[in-house]
Amino acid sequence: MRHGSQNSEHPDSFGARDVIEVAGESFEIFRLLNAVPSAGSLPYSLRILLENLLRHEDGVHVHAGLVDALAAWDPRGPAPEILFHPARVVMQDYSGVPCLVDLAAMREAFVRLGGAAETLSPQVPVDLVVDHSVMADVFGTPDAYARNAALDHARNRERYELLRWAEATFDRLRIVPPNTGIIHQVNLERLAGVVIADDTGSLPALYPDTVVGTDSHTPMVNGLGVLGWGVGGIEAVAAVLGRPLTLRVPKVIGCELTGRPADGVTATDIVLTLTERLRAHGVVGAYIEFNGPGLAALSAADRATIANMCPEYGATAALFPVDDEVLRYLRATGRPERHLDLVRAYAETQGLWYDPAAAATIRYTERVRFDLASVVPSIAGPRRPQDRVPLATTRTAFAEAVSEVNGGTARRAEVTAPDGSRHTLGDGAVVLAAITSCTNTSNPALMIAAGLLARKAVELGLQPRPWVKSTLAPGSAAVMEYLARAGLDTYLDKLGFSLVAYGCTSCIGNSGPLPESVAGAVRESGLASVAVLSGNRNFEGRINPDVRMNYLASPPLVVAYALAGTMDIDLTTEPLGTGSDGRPVTLADIWPDSREIDEVARTAVDPGTYTQMYDSLMAGDERWRALPAHPQQLFPWAEDSTYIAPPPYFVGTTARPRPLDDIRGARVLADLGDSVTTDHISPAGGIPAHSAAGVFLRELGVPPGDFNSYGARRCNHEVLLRGLFSNPRLRNRLAAGKTGGHTVNHLTGELTTMYEAAVAYQEAGVPLVVLAGREYGTGSSRDWAAKGPALIGVRAVIAESFERIHRSNLVGMGILPLEFPAGQNARTLGLTGAEEFDISGVREFSESVPRTVRVTAGAVSFDAVVRVDTAMEAEFIRHGGIMPFTLRGLLESA
């Protein structure tokens, strides 16, 4: 049975199965509007989910009742629970490599319990893009790319050997080699089809392209009308094995776009403004669908930039409709005309083609309006993406923000730059300027604007500030090709923005070290140093450990701030520097207008560029091709590896789950505040030499220069466990004012490290809980932020609210996500974190899904809301997580 379309035994209860002709070819479809006429008033995203149910109907798991429930969806009624079979899965390596290690370990357990190894294999197409590993160590030189690539391969050889084994062993798995591109840009420019033409059956089939990805920014592909969202690596393993995702149909918010952006306003400005407004409005967990006359003012690349930051405004998906602009983008990126014909014919037949006249009849939960003409040039920072600052008020806003960072005491630092020049820097000194991230480098208009601005700056004689580390890491080689064709790459080079990698780099914290002369001066003085990047996240401590304030900006503004060298400036009125003629040069003097950008794009951006580049997408360089790629049914673990170790999730796993018990005598490991990110819980950046993980690696004989990052070592649980809650910016109320990975061991009263306390609790058989405020687990879809706590004995997290993916990850690891009663938190309830916690009602999961459980902590008792949202999630809790549940299900069906 193929994945996309069922066999002849499909019940087809609604008579949806049909055949359409496109250009003389016949294709099977499940005709949506004929089978379910009410689908015409559903939001586009729910139409896609409805087609998915019709196509996967089996009469048992996907039955007619699910179809009826979704077809009758009431925007203001209870949310029906449905199943969803994504057409494919995409992964980046930081989360994808652990998924493959989990699959390898699960396969071993499967064989141990009597299954056949080959049965446990991917059942849907999986593309893993290696983009998270490379670091921008070398910069500002013509050979920076080559040297960083060599360092990356040397550091990650073991991980890459595992990928080569997996690609050779597992069917349906493709690996996009390192330094080729960024997952979401590769997905946008090549992998996404909008409509899938599946020729694996006797009759070719057409159905919507849908995707889940092990990265929270997977919704970027929503810009092409492809429904998809981010999931944790834990949930992804089940999806890879063909298990449907279970979900409650979310709120769907219609966002009407009106007006046109003013000249000089970029897609980055639009998405930062939209992020601010939608985050304030409250769209957490919702699907957003964009419509309205303003769509005509946005290119598909602009739409993708907006969809990329969907997690930052809190939504699950941010869907743009399929229309002529989507076809134009597919053509511009080298997709064949035959496929464009299929996309149009299928979308029009199924009611998935955008119909402006019908927008008013769609059943949305609510509608909001966003005027593109209201957007002004902006940046966001210094700590959250939603903290937008209009460019005209940045100096004032910075003064307010820096006073919080430095406690009202201004700092200065004497710095010797890499070129030997000496400078006195003040708070706000820009020490890192990074054109990075698929969010913006996927957008030709933004990258061309940066190149044109650089050209004008060079022509007027502006020089780069020598203390600024400047990097350029686009999401695909197509970017450098069209910049070179336009002659703009040389100007970026002259300002220090030389190519360092094709990978995420600074956006995920792989900025590489600052020059030691700069970093040392910053550390010694306590200077409030600044990074400006074209990424999508600027959480505290994320970008570089020696940077205290992070601002998001468009690529041309990144170049501008690198020229200014400081955030303590009003770019709308003050000069960036002095030109070769001795006159001041302002931002207005070098800012390109839209006509210039469009003219360059017309001549430099060519479909052939994309076709040529992506034809060799899976090839890799000589180092990659030289790695062994021998298929073996079971992975050959190396006992002395410090990168890859068999995970302990399946140790002692039995064919049937053990009964659940209530939680008794639990102690609080951490008492945290609001907006605790997955970076706080499980860092991804460099491993400090003095940290518990660093000490552990040194004891194994690994020199500090080879520590690599937490993200790269995510397949060694011993390293990652020692890194839990060790972010230097973490604030734990139990840590007596110390930041970082410290807590109180309640058994002894001693202040100690998180890891040492967790070990002591485990040895004493004491379960753990974590207390938190709002938005616990925000940020990256980092499965280790749930895996780690589960392995050290955390049984429950009690918070005011949870970020969507992290809540799902907690459930996926068997940890209970519990919410305080509405309007309450640890402080209002009088909790100190020193209490012993009993949680009653957990054993009810054996029979049902309890809505609340009783929490007793000392003299305080309250009913916590159980955020186990579906019956299937309750099964995960019963089984101790999604992976044991999936393993047992495969054993039963084998």
Curated annotation (Swiss-Prot):
Disruption phenotype: Disruption mutant loses the ability to produce PTT, but it shows normal growth behavior and is able to form aerial mycelium and to sporulate. Disruption of the gene does not affect aconitase activity. [4Fe-4S] cluster binds at C438, C504, C507. InterPro entries: AcnA_IRP_Swivel, Acnase/IPM_dHydase_lsu_aba_1/3, Acoase/IPM_deHydtase_lsu_aba, Aconitase/3IPM_dehydase_swvl, Aconitase/IRP2, Aconitase_4Fe-4S_BS, Aconitase_4Fe-4S_dom, AconitaseA/IPMdHydase_ssu_swvl. One of its GO terms (biological process) is tricarboxylic acid cycle. It catalyses: phosphinomethylmalate = phosphinomethylisomalate; phosphinomethylmalate = 2-(phosphinatomethylidene)butanedioate + H2O; 2-(phosphinatomethylidene)butanedioate + H2O = phosphinomethylisomalate. Its EC number is 4.2.1.166. Pathway: Secondary metabolite biosynthesis; bialaphos biosynthesis. Its cofactor is [4Fe-4S] cluster. Belongs to the aconitase/IPM isomerase family. Isomerase involved in the biosynthesis of phosphinothricin tripeptide (PTT), also known as bialaphos (BA), a natural-product antibiotic and potent herbicide. Probably catalyzes the isomerization of phosphinomethylmalate to phosphinomethylisomalate. Shows no standard aconitase activity with citrate as a substrate and is not able to complement an acnA mutant. This is Phosphinomethylmalate isomerase. It comes from Streptomyces viridochromogenes (strain DSM 40736 / JCM 4977 / BCRC 1201 / Tue 494).
